[in-house]
Amino acid sequence: MVIGDWRKQVPASRFGGADRPGRIGGAREPTASWWGGRRVTRRGVEITLGVLWLVDGALQFQPSMFTRGFFVDMLGMANMGLPGPVSTVEYDLTSMLAAHPALWNALFAALQVALGAGLLWRRTARAALGLSILWALSVWIVGEGVGGLFMGGTNLLTGAPGAALLYALIAVTIWPRRASGGALGAPVSTGGGVPGAPVSTHGGVPGASASGGVGARAGRSVADEGVLGGALARWMWLLVWFGTAALELEPASHTPAAQLTTTGEGEPGAVAAVNHAIGGLFTGWDLPFVVVFAFLQVAVGVGVLAPRTRRPALAAGVALALATGLAGQDLGGLLTGNATDPGTGPVLALFAVTLWPRTAVGEALEAGPAAVPGGALAR
């Protein structure tokens, strides 16, 4: 049984250093993360992704989804602005799905529930993760019309680049890499610039070295353990935020006050009133809002490249994602009866979590009870 915080049970001398406050193994412990030093694991991200798919599947069972109008309206909106050949394919798919809406919707809803359940069960998680990538990309292209990127007025505030694309990016980011020994998902080190090198240990703590003590692996994230590696995952984050910032250059994106106000359409009266109030705050300030908003998005994207600014950039990204998800999208319009997902806000925040650098303590906790000498984590 895991007992609380192992730092309170094991004297620092057990790790080869003086028993001094704030130190482990003679080295100063890094500052705890913004969620209180709790573990951020690949499996935790995978489970969260599974919960999101379950939510999407549940939303797909809403009565309005089983009607012809749902497919005609949704795919008709997705078709706006698409290039000619793609638009033709989208139109043909709309006709096919609208012919038997109840059957197709039941299949889609069941598939999303199955993906979510599969991600929650370890034995099927890898297969479900792979299938979720294919389905998410299909939804992004067909159901969201490539995230609405060809339609004027699409930006971060209204849901760009599309929740489905972010589902796929997260799934690819946490896809387990194969260690040199052949074990899928085994811990690997990127220390010293050699991906796949075995993780060093000292004093029973993974990532410790004979000279540096605990913390040699600190700063690594869930993405670092994935098949893409942390560096490529961070560039993907940069591309997402640069892309949304570029969308602010469109003239149709220069009316944020109106976009915030119209978010309330179809919402209950109280929610719509809040949307109108938020939109009213920025009336007459559209251009300054767009400039500052675009600058913040660029800063969030660039900030992850430097270790020193990575945490602040990711924290700012989470704040922006949740703010736009709530004020700009009403969490995908969950209360309208027509929502298919909770919007891009929660998913973009989850992407940030996969990139969040762990502390040395988080690395030791991630390694499990065996990492602590004398079995201090177990009783």
Describe every region a protein language model picked out.
Residues 1-114, 121-379:
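Extended, low-polarity transmembrane helix blocks
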